[in-house]
């Protein structure tokens, strides 16, 4: 994973049209966030010291907010990586401290 990959994913997230077809937008959003999670996990396994991991975690944190997102990305992704010893508590805290928790 490099900055170009992150920039591409960020652009994909920003280009989602939430005002048109919400279900389509929601599906696209989950696809991009799931890809981002895949990049993060792969990078943690291959190059755990990579600085792009922090940037990817921030991008993920900035794009989750509703309760379903937290279950999917906090409980089932971030906490799982911590439990497996792949993600440090400091990096997990970076994610938690930068989420935008909202109702929805």
Residue ranges and their predicted role:
Residues 8, 55, 76, 90-94:
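Alpha-solenoid helical repeat scaffolds
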Residues 30, 34-86:
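Acidic, low-complexity, intrinsically disordered interaction modules
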Residues 80-104:
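Eukaryotic acidic, Ser/Thr-rich intrinsically disordered low-complexity regions
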């Amino acid at each position: 994973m490099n900055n170009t990959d992150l920039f591409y994913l960020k652009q994909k997230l920003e280009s989602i049209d939430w005002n048109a077809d919400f279900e389509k937008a929601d599906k696209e959003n989950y696809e991009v966030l799931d890809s981002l999670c895949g990049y993060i996990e792969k990078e943690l396994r291959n190059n755990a010291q990579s600085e792009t991991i922090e940037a990817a975690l921030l991008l993920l944190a900035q794009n989750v907010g509703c309760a379903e997102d937290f279950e999917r990305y906090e409980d089932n992704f971030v906490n799982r990586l911590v439990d497996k010893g792949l993600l440090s508590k400091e990096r997990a805290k970076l994610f938690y401290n930068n989420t935008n928790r909202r109702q929805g």
